[in-house]
């Protein structure tokens, strides 16, 4: 493809609450075996983009570990490959990234040393599958300076959490509102852009000169009436992880057959780092219905409408309903869990009762484990 990729994965949000204490949002576990960033990385390699930069910052340890080998996404190359950028103190700079535009500016050499004419920019917290070649073809056909991907928002109340755009008949962006109370349209910006590399360098350098740091506010919105910015609609599944409720809802969507088939049965595939773990084990007395169960898990109880990630142990006479159990969780006997998200590495003592009443309840239990 005639483009390089740039994934912005350094953000933090208070709406993730306790779930963001261990990891960046881009490293949040999804659908049993995956991380959020896997979807953007897979889209890049499936679109034949062979050179990708990932910008990280907040709580990036888990994300860096996940990206430690680029072979899983076919980026183990002599030319191109996967490049991970973190804030670093230099003679010219002693600050962390102050925004998305600033994070690109502090790694501008990645763009200047590349030769591809276009750049595809994507967020690391979007759950979707698309061919960026279609976006690039649309961008060229429209003669646009910048093209962004948009999707229809099913619930109008969600507009307060996203950037909402309005298009004219020529698919040009005529209005962009950042997190409005009442949106003028139902089109949400997905945080995916294509732009000519030289133009991006020019705009980013101008932002730096004027001490402007945000890509959306200081480039997309500011230049909306100066540059030709077009919107490319996608009609397939798209979700963004920006809150505990988003995270819960997105994972639960994977219990729907059409969503699972779209991501995991239809070409192309979604790739992730593979752990060598044994298959899940269902002991006598277990009963599992409409759930996703990852490798290394042992189940002795009842699991219904839930997602269990890797290395989860469910004790005898346990009931787990409509819940998400993250990696390496031990659940003691006679435990009831419903409408909850159990943080990784947790130990739920026997005879416990947890139920989320108003939305999903986040459980962080750090009791001692005894292995005999």
Where are the regions a protein language model picked out?
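Unchanged
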Residues: 1-254, 364-365
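Left-handed beta-helix
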Residues: 1-4, 198, 206-372
